Amino acid sequence: MKNQENKIAANKRLAELLGWSHIAEVGGALVGTPPAGAAASRGQALVPDWAGDWAAAGPLAVAYDVAIEPGARTSSAGGYMVHHYLHASKNTAITFAIAMVVMHKLASAQ
């Protein structure tokens, strides 16, 4: 359960840094108001699962030039190292690392 809570917290913080607002947890997922320019969302949308889904994390990694270095027991994304055993799978460990490094980049730029 702790990993799920960490993932939700990471996605929420990243969404805030990317300009989302009015973010709320609904049944283990996050919904909120996307950044300006997302008029088709009618004011509310599902926050992408950057910390757990490649469909969301992949484009994020490309947009923020995150180099991914997979390994046998640990992997890193943009220099943020993760231990696979702390996550449900190697994939979720790496997507979590992508979210964390992008959060760090955005927070540092503020």
Question: Where are each of the predicted segments found?
Answer:
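Glycine-rich anion-binding surface patch
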Residues: 1-110
